């Protein structure tokens, strides 16, 4: 079996991670003691991807939980599925990172990192054939961003040929905790560009807008945002957890979605959007799901796909539905909006169907797209970064932990390069490609 090792770090990472395990335990028929109580063989067929079967037939998540303070972990432990995790896999410090990336990456986090790596190694040795890691973290704080990216680079050193998937929550002024979020996020992106293979971008701004506009919640809480995230994470990973053809492991997902190695930041969408506790009363049709899923209002990242072009995209439909109808609808979308897809990557939209729908829905769909419009989000963070950095605001918090201003400048230019690369491929046409090739041939001759 091809196992995936799940790692969650920091307050946000642990909260969305805990929700993710609640959701997938439900889907696989695992109760809160780890016993199987489901009703379908499909639930068990690929259960080993995320769970380790322990003595007495209990299923234990392949999860490592880390934080620099004990608070969030205590609440995970006392939560509904807190007893299902391996007690040794909780690794925490006492000091906290104080929303400071440098503390998470260089000082406090660096002291704790070896204990985390020990647990990661132990879990990896338990695997038959480890396919990769998935990391849940936010980029606005100190632990998830600083220590999270430190762990990613350490794992990269030790397991260079394994896939690294991240679920990264980007900060937003609308749902802001601290003033230094743009610093932390930029320093993290600098790391993720180099060390992660695929990043599912979750963006607090977009999640907030979905709760407010679509779900009509007057004051969205983090619980509401996390409900959306967990539904999306469940959808993105469903093809890894249930038998199926398309994107059945992390590497195949990457092959289908990443045309250029640095451009691995994906927008994710989900349909139908439901608020916590309310289930849909009316079954949706495939055309409605498809239409909702491609709608920019459903994207979990505050960038409008209509302002850019899709390099690649992939859709996972869940529930009992006709594959033929799914393919027709997806073709329909591409034909009607052909200007929004780059023409120089043929067959760049894939779709798959998984028979098991999420709990409480007849059918649902999840969308993962590699769109050049995601540069809007990087631009937004970059502008906030520059506004503070050119006045050297709050820098002493970072230099005091031994960082150099140079590192900020590098991170800033790396992020701006990323934006420029997205722009370059957005403007590229098939003619450019042919022209460049001809030039190269002439040079060779």
From Swiss-Prot:
Transmembrane segments: none annotated. GO terms for biological process: microtubule cytoskeleton organization; mitotic cell cycle. It comes from the Eukaryota. SMART domains: Tubulin, Tubulin_C. PROSITE patterns: TUBULIN, TUBULIN_B_AUTOREG. It holds the Pfam family Tubulin_C. PANTHER family: TUBULIN (PTHR11588). This is Tubulin beta-7 chain. It comes from Zea mays. The lineage of its organism: Eukaryota, Viridiplantae, Streptophyta, Embryophyta, Tracheophyta.
């Amino acid at each position: 079996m091809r196992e995936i090792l799940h790692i969650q770090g920091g307050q946000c990472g642990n909260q969305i991670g805990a929700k993710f395990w609640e959701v997938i335990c439900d889907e696989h028929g695992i109760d809160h003691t780890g016993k199987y109580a489901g009703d379908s063989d499909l639930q068990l067929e690929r259960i080993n991807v995320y769970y380790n079967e322990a003595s007495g037939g209990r299923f234990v998540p392949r999860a490592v939980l880390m934080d620099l303070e004990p608070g969030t972990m205590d609440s995970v432990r006392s939560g509904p599925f807190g007893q299902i995790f391996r007690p040794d896999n909780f690794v925490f410090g006492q000091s906290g990172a104080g929303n400071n990336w440098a503390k998470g990456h260089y000082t406090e986090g660096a002291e704790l990192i070896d204990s985390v790596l020990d647990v990661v190694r132990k879990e990896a040795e338990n695997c038959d054939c480890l396919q990769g890691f998935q990391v849940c973290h936010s980029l606005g704080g100190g632990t998830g961003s600083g220590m999270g990216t430190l762990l990613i680079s350490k794992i990269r050193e030790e397991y260079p040929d394994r896939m690294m998937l991240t679920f990264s929550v980007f900060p937003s002024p609308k749902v802001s905790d601290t003033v230094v979020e743009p610093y932390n996020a930029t320093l993290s992106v600098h790391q993720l560009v180099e060390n992660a293979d695929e990043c599912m971008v979750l963006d607090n701004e977009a999640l907030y807008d979905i709760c407010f506009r679509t779900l009509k919640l007057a004051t969205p809480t983090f619980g509401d945002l996390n409900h959306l995230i967990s539904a999306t994470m469940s959808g993105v990973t469903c093809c890894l957890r249930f038998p199926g053809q398309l994107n059945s492991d992390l590497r195949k997902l990457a092959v289908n979605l990443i045309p250029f190695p640095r451009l691995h930041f994906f927008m994710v969408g989900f349909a139908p959007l439901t608020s916590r506790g309310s289930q849909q009363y009316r079954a949706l049709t495939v055309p409605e799901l498809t239409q909702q899923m491609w709608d920019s209002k459903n994207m979990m990242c505050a960038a409008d796909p209509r302002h850019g072009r899709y390099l690649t995209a992939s859709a996972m439909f869940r529930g009992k539905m006709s594959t033929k109808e799914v393919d027709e609808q997806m073709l329909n979308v591409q034909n009607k909006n052909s200007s929004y897809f780059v023409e120089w990557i043929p067959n760049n939209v894939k779709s798959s169907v998984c028979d098991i729908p999420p709990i409480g829905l007849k059918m649902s769909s999840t969308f993962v797209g590699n769109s050049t419009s995601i540069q809007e989000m990087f631009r937004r963070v970059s502008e906030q970064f520059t506004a503070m950095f050119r006045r050297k605001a709050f820098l002493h918090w970072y230099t005091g932990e031994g960082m150099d201003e140079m590192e900020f400048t590098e991170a800033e230019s790396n992020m701006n390069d990323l934006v420029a690369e997205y722009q370059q491929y957005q403007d590229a046409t098939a003619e450019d490609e042919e022209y460049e090739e001809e030039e190269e041939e002439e040079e060779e001759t």
